[in-house]
């Protein structure tokens, strides 16, 4: 179902989309691209499902693309490969990317920092690092730490 939403995509576009998404594993499935993977792809790992979703998103070479944390379920090695290929796709399209990982945020030409449900700052990654303490704090990884100790219920 890689061509879902882009039924007119040719074989070359499908191969390119699979390559961008590092989803070449589909060729190792019993029937390749024709393999049934079950409802919602339940026979695939989370990372495999995410890579197929990314391939589906880029197969039609859209002019506008919305991606919601497109690399969150990938291991570090695959994430690095997908990022490199995704950079090429993003050069040819307008994209809105919701991201939490610093490496994904750095793919953007412009970054909008959301805080308290509002846009708190807009700029390049470097501008926000320099000029916005909250952004710098989040990019440092400090935002990944728990807010405080978890209290155990009394017994």
Explain the meaning of each model-derived region.
Residues 11, 31-32, 79, 84, ...:
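C-terminal portion of ABC ATPase nucleotide-binding domains
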Residues 65-68:
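Catalytic Walker B motif of ABC-type/P-loop ATPase nucleotide-binding domains
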Residues 1-38, 87, 92:
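ABC ATPase nucleotide-binding domain helical subdomain, centered on the C-loop/LSGGQ "ABC signature"
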Residues 59-63, 92:
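A short, proline-enriched helix->beta-strand linker immediately N-terminal to the Walker B motif
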Residues 54, 98:
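Hydrophobic anchor residue at the start of the ABC signature
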Residues 24-52, 70, 74-77, 145-155:
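ABC-fold ATPase nucleotide-binding domain signature/coupling loops
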Residues 1-9, 41-44, 72-74, 103:
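Short, contiguous acidic/charged loop-to-helix segments that flank catalytic cores in large enzymes
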């Amino acid at each position: 179902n890689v061509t879902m939403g882009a039924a007119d995509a040719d074989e070359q576009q499908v191969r390119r989309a699979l390559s961008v998404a590092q989803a070449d594993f589909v060729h190792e499935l019993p029937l390749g691209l024709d393999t049934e993977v079950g409802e919602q792809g339940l026979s695939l790992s989370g990372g495999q499902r995410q890579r197929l979703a990314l391939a589906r998103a880029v197969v039609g070479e859209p002019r506008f693309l919305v991606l919601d944390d497109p690399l969150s379920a990938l291991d570090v090695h695959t994430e690095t490969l997908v990022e490199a290929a995704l950079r090429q796709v993003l050069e040819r399209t307008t994209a809105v990317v919701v991201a939490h990982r610093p490496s994904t945020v750095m793919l953007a030409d412009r970054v909008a920092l959301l805080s308290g449900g509002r846009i708190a700052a807009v700029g390049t990654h470097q501008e926000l690092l320099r000029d916005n303490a909250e952004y710098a704090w989040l990019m440092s990884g400090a935002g990944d730490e728990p807010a405080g100790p978890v209290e155990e219920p009394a017994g």
